[in-house]
């Protein structure tokens, strides 16, 4: 009779496939929240005659409602194709490389719980490596998401994700695809460390509590916690990254940081915090839950008699 025997580990390619699939599924589910976050981050203070500010987008729910009203429901999924491009590459690499890099840091003979600082270092490295490769997809996603409702007769900059890649290269040069790479490396390395290392550590801690095991509940709790840490730590860098990618008037990362701080104050770096947390918390819960379940499929050995 045919049967299955559990495997101890899966290959890098299998991990890459699992990670890319889980990241794409989470992206598809949560990109409206990401679109709201980008719009809030790119929004600047608008002076009026009486000295007050009347922002177009107010809060996560208000932003979602405004986009849906002005641009239709499909407007909430702007940049989804580029987002899926990004997750296939970035999601697959950052998670797929995490375990091999951890093993490289501690040695293949290591037995026991890997120290937290080693997990953080591994996640920092894989996040940086992955986004260097995936930066063009991130740039295109932000450019597409940043376009709101345009006045009558004003054409859109890009017809879609593929057109955006070609248009950017044609008008701005190949190097433009890596615009904002500096803050993007910083942001994604830090957020990746906050997500992967915290998920790893929290899951490990939860499973030491009586009656808790490697279950759906454990994955959900650890995923939500990972999203919270990621937003708290990465939000300022995320704002700078979004502004540099969505607005070419900034000379560099420092210029963007100084101008934002000078004109809008420190709280500008936490614009879109609620939709960002709602999105990342949900994203991480969905992604890690999906990842754990898909990996279980690969962790079953090939059918044998």
UniProtKB/Swiss-Prot annotation:
Subcellular localization: Mitochondrion inner membrane
Which ranges does the record mark as transmembrane?
Answer: 16-36, 73-93, 120-140, 179-199, 220-240, 270-290
Q: Which of UniProt's keywords are assigned here? A: Membrane, Mitochondrion, Mitochondrion inner membrane, Repeat, Stress response, Transmembrane, Transmembrane helix, Transport
Any idea which GO molecular function terms this record carries?
A: amino acid transmembrane transporter activity
Chief localisation class: mitochondrion
Q: What biological function has been recorded for the protein in this entry?
A: PUMPS are mitochondrial transporter proteins that create proton leaks across the inner mitochondrial membrane, thus uncoupling oxidative phosphorylation. This leads to a decrease in the efficiency of oxidative phosphorylation and an increase in heat production. May be involved in protecting plant cells against oxidative stress damage.
* Protein name per UniProt: Mitochondrial uncoupling protein 2
What organism does the record attribute this protein to? Arabidopsis thaliana
